[in-house]
Amino acid sequence: MNKNQNDWKVELRKATRSSLISITNETDFQLQRISCKLQQGMLRLIPPEIIPPKSSIEFGTESNAFMTGTKGSVIYIVLPPSSSPINVGSIQSLTHLQSLKLWDPLVYIIIEWSTPYWSQHSCSIQVQPQQNSSLLNVKSNLSQREINKQIHSEVLMFIHNNDSNGEIQFKIYKNSLSNSGNGSSGGNNNNNNNSLNNSNNSIGSSGGNGGGGSNGSSPSMSPQFTSISKTNSPQIINTSSNNLNSSSGNNNKPIFSIVDNDYTSSQSTSSIPVVAGINSNSNSNTSGSGSTSISSPNSSFSSSLPSFFSNNFPLPWSNDGFGVDGGWKANVKRGSRGQFITIRNNTSKHLIRRNQTCLNSGRWCEPPPEGIPPNSMIEFGSVSSGFTTGTDGVIHYHSQGSKSDFRFQFNNPLMGKSSFTYHCPNGFNVEEKYTDGNISSVSFTINEGDSQTIPKQIPDSPLPIPPIKTDPKQVFINDDSIRIFSFNVGSINVKESGKELMNINNNNNNNNSNNNNNNNDQNKDKDNQMLNNSNLINKRIEQISKNLINFSEKYDIILLQEVFLDSSKDILIKNLKIYYPYIIDRCGENSGLFFASRFPPLWNEFRQFNNGIGSDVKYGKGVQGVKLDISTIKENTYLYVFNANLQANPDNSIAWQMVNGDDKQRKAATVRTLQLQSIRDFISTELAMQSSTIANSALLLVGDFNLNAEVEQVISDHESNSITLSQIIPELAKKINSKEITLTFSYQLLEYLNDLNIPMRYLGILRSQLQNNRMKSLVLTEMITYIIKKDIIEHLTQRHNQYQSNINEDEQIYREVVLETFNLIFHYTRKDCIQFWRHHLRKRLRSEFSSSLSEIEQQDWVDLRTHVINLQLFTSLKYSLEITFNPKAVFQIMKGSRINTKEIIPIPLILPEQIEEIILPPLTSYWGSDSNTDINYFTNIDHLKEQQKKQAQLQQLQQQQAQQQQQAQQQTQQQQNSNINIINTIESSQIQQNNNIQIYLKQTDEYNNMLKILGNPVDLFRESNPFSPGYTIHQSLNQRVEKPSLKERVDYILNFKLSPNFGDHEGRNQLLKLECTETNIVPMGATPQTRLSNHFALECILHIKKK
């Protein structure tokens, strides 16, 4: 089965010590694992039992106890080209294997690795026995990576032919493998072959005088290798066919064969020779003069785990007397807590183990084999590996044609009783028998046919499952369809809760005059009302969950929204876990999303939206993405399911009453538009990263969108975005990786982004495709700079709106905010600085950028300060915020931004007087936009209309002047000023606010021609982001500094309403670039030399700059 290759590696790197071993088989021979042993740690991924020719495999081990490492070894035997994998369960030792003389020479490879906690790590690979060591060449490469005192070693091992000696010439002894004696197969043999072939498993049986057939035991071949060649070994396939066809002849030795759909591309089989006299558990059936024996269900299948390496060591499954003390069962019994697991497969299905086995605590003494053939039994075990610990884990097996897995879970804790649970697909039932104790054992028996009773629940489970009346005929439909259920479970109760809350508030208002005792009674009544509301929700959840499992046609995937209460999640888990083994109930922080499926998830990620408004402020709504393996429906196929819950519409709740403005519905729609854009980017990012498997995948987006389709316009995905993700960004990353493009400073990176029209929100995707750590640090620095600048603007906006400050006051506020920010992020010894880098910044990076952090960087224990160059970050912030410090401040910043420094750094790090110059950001980037009264735009038509109104008002003023002499003089002065400047015709008697700017646009011919083609200009970013900073039409004008030496500023200052997909991260349209060629600043009050005053007007002529 194909699976996400990075899932188990992510878990592997979380350990304090880990080893990733890669083995490349460059020979023309198969390598079969006959032993695997761990002295320390646990196996995150078990070594595959077969390494095909010209292929490579990977597995990993990790520490699983405090202050321990990982150490282990594995033995692979070289198989001749014409031989199939042997039955390792029948081999007592390597000496025993040599004595059987199956072939000559016998060559095996010993691989050892060690990543201890204290000493140096090491690895070795040897070809044994010594006299045959020159037949193959082996080499190894060991590398180590340390991250926050965690050591991760990677071992690369290569096995290839010795060119000087030529290819190994094997001599196979036929008397040990096939025909000897006289006899011919009887009719029963053919019947056995036909019946077993119909059950997807082939057994070649032979009969003769005194000949016996035995069902040998061997795990299936590994499904997890990465093949170098796209074709399988022809020797294996041809040999399998020959062995299967030889159903008659003189055979004393039986042949057992299994089907492995993961290894071969067709339903071919691989025959496994079984040594006579080893397997004693068999039932004999005679027919004529010959006999045929099929293995009983008690035949044991096992992989290997020896206790030490020598030519005569007993392998762990040996039943001889000298092998008892060194066997794996003895190792289980030595532990403080141990677990024996037995699984009997009484069905006609071949069960294949999932690549990854989960052992939460303890270590494998005997790992579970990779296959369970029909009518056979396997045994394996685990033991505790640390002080005051137990052992628990879960194993998954799947069968072709079943929609879900067989799941077996065990837990033998240090304190308390052992517990076991299981899950089986439709059409099967499992019987369980267990023995409790320090060394507990459990036996699972898999039978065909639906069970008449509900599976037994785990003893002492915190969520016992009550008996539910279900019809045994209610089964999942076994076809090629997938049934999905999506529902908002809180849609009704939210309204009920709002009404109850309003009643509570009304009661509070009516009883304000009561004494304190009455208030206490009132608070109790409020608590009771909230408790009753929770009970109503839980009752509804209980009913919904029971209906889901009692449907005549059960759903394969269940997606719910607004499951906020923990008690509701517990009810859903309690009722659904019987039929849905894969449940994800913890998704983000208070997101309300719930996922249950019969298909195993391969990838799961949650993307939280930016802060909502109204009642959504207290929730962490977002979108959840899950990649499901639906190979049981169609081979090698996947399903991407995205579950989202968008901004709710306004209601009469208190939270919505606190939202300013009258057009609350439009504000909610605007937030939903941004959330849909976030969903689009989230999906596009994942599909771009999984481009290799996207051809075999399907995608589904469900959830509660709260959209009014008749009014709202949903953003459609533009072709330019897909081109940016699939072509432009990968090409840029390729050029940077090959050093065709060299980037040293941040401004160079921004220039490439602007030239290629790559939005800032795609910086995370670009970083995920870079290989050089220096370039990754540079991109991460720009993302952090963008977030810090955005946070500063938000703080400035809040203070400006709170105090209704003017420009002079804003400059002082801005200075204080910038100073506070620099003292926070560069003072590494402060606790709030550590909190910022480890929690706040990581959360903001996830919300603003897709795939911004790697798997390791997403962990809470990773300090992002080690991934950023402090001088580069300071320089980027300095240019972005337009601030200049004196040399002493720069020295203090570099001194304070040292990790683990023992020097005492003063607080604050820098002082206000150390700022030499600071430029206030554009006014429209932080001014309030609810009423949009801070900025007034005037065109020719607007000016004429305003002039007509002014003339009427001037006539009224002239009449008043005739009555009062003082008013007449003021009116005459205003008329003289109106002839000087066109702007002064605006009503001067109108009381203007401190933050009111009036801009008059005198249109040019180029501008009018462009209007005929593109329509009227609008502030697109301000329209779609009413609560976010953005550029407006006067961006390049409101910051002009009138100095002779200053170069005239050119900027994107006008937006045409083309498409929401156009425009960069600050809302500027990159298709049209305008420059201001003529300006006339008309002071209406005191005007500072370096800044525009509180009251002013601009008369500007805009010309379109042709590219």
Curated annotation (Swiss-Prot):
Biased composition (Low complexity): 180-204, 238-251, 501-521
This protein's name: Uncharacterized protein DDB_G0272682
InterPro entries: Endo/exonu/phosph_ase_sf, Sph/SMPD2-like
Coiled coil (residue ranges): 789-816, 940-1012
PANTHER family from the UniProt entry: ENDONUCLEASE_EXONUCLEASE_PHOSPHATASE DOMAIN-CONTAINING PROTEIN, SPHINGOMYELINASE FAMILY MEMBER
GO CC annotation terms, alphabetical: cytoplasm
GO molecular function: phospholipase activity; sphingomyelin phosphodiesterase activity
Keywords, comma-separated and alphabetical: Coiled coil
Residue ranges, annotated region (Disordered): 180-251, 501-530
Compositionally biased region (Gly residues): 205-215
Record carries keyword Coiled coil: yes
Ranges annotated as biased composition (Polar residues): 219-237
Protein biosynthesis recorded as keyword: no
